[in-house]
Amino acid sequence: MDNRDYAWLPSLRPAGSDEKQACSECHFRGKAGSGPILPVDEWLEDAHSQSAVNPRFLTMHSGTDISGRRSPATRFRRTDSGLAALPPDPEEPYYGPGYRLDNPDHTGDCGACHVPAAAVNAPYNTDPYWVQGVEAEGIPSDFCHKIWDVRLDAATGLPFPEKAGVLSYEFRRPFKGHQFFAGPLDDIAPGEDTYSKLQKSSQFCAPCHFGVFWGTVVYDSYGEWLRSPYSAEGNGKTCQDCHMPGSGAELFARAEKGGLKRDPKTIVSHRMPGARDLDLLRNAVSLSLEAEPAPEGIRVRTKIVNDRTGHHVPTDSPLRHLILVVRAYGGGAGELSLKAGPVLPEWCGSGNPADGNYAGLPGKVFVKMLEEMWTGVSPTAAYWNPTRIVMDTRLEAYQTDSGEFLFTAPGSGDVRIEAVLLYRRAYKKLMELKGWNEPDIVMESAAVTLNFNFGVRHPN
């Protein structure tokens, strides 16, 4: 049974409140506290706790930049099959796309994943700008521990299309006078705390990490895992194995609140590192670089292996991409020109490379790029509209990508070849329009030195 009128418990006690049921009453140390880090402390560092107030999410939903300036409403033209959107008017100020620009009369189902505590009873009618209290906590602790089951398509093992987030979960919200928490510990005393094996299963993550819009699979980290060797029973890894490893703590509740010492292996971290975690990104793939003199110049080979990630890299949001930049210097000639090999596309940014503009430089991109069916805009961030996938060069689990570049050779002297693999959260132009300050992250780098006086190769 599920009580639709249940009031979610806050993860943190609101300031000035005498709330005694907040999760933080037992599971929070706080910066001024002593003792081990507890689950709510870790949850505060987790991006899930910020999903309702994430400025990228909010500005993409509203069609504004971070200063609140709004793009003009979308223009439409009539076709034989109905109305079709037009590209933005280049004569008008523009601050990037927005769901509400294209759909002014409804809020969509974005809240089903980003604001689930509010959307659970109104999945198609939750405006993220109007939520408050526990509903603005993103993915609250109480929400996760009320999930009892996930509805998946038996034929595919995936959530049903168009059933994101709360639309694919089954909840157990208690009625007045009772409480209920589902969790991963199987040795708790019988009562309102209940063991759920789902809490340690990747299926728990599926509804918010698989998204289909207009028949196009836009984000699919759960499906990518499901199709990879990581999903194999026995010797595979679950999402939780990587994103909720053991925290090393012996308590998950304060001792004075009844917390018992446990085997640290049974207590998992609630930080859930993801796309903003430097350690995770820098341990996702491997990069190697080789260079050798050739009759026609300097031949450079790169190899990137997705050897440590159980899904594609990058994954989920199609705005994310990796940029491999390969450059050669030396021999008194400054930067050496590329004679043959791939170069980076215009959307990597035109201008000074010191400012993150890499268009035209030797390199490769790893991206799932979408094109709007109506407007032809590509790359597009408005994936709520009908789109098609125009390229997908991301690295699958255990996949190797090899690149080859030929640079002009100097007459003599040392030549240094550098390769840098960057993680970029969104297309550069979009970030400029929205005012997002998201510096590139160096995931991997490598360098090699060639001495053209003796033809000696010195790896760095």
Spell out what each predicted region is.
Residues 16-21, 103, 107, 138-141, ...:
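Residues immediately within or flanking Cys/His clusters that coordinate Zn2+
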Residues 95, 112, 116-123:
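Conserved, well-structured interaction surfaces
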Residues 411-413:
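Surface-exposed, short loops/turns at beta-strand junctions within beta-sandwich domains
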Residues 94-99, 103:
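Flexible glycine-rich active-site/ligand-binding loops centered on an Asp-His dyad
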Residues 3-6, 11-26:
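Short, contiguous pre-domain boundary segments
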Residues 1-11, 32-90, 97, 123-397, ...:
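Primarily the internal scaffold of c-type cytochrome electron-transfer domains
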Residues 105, 109-115, 205-209:
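Extended, loop-rich substrate-binding clefts of extracytoplasmic carbohydrate-active enzymes
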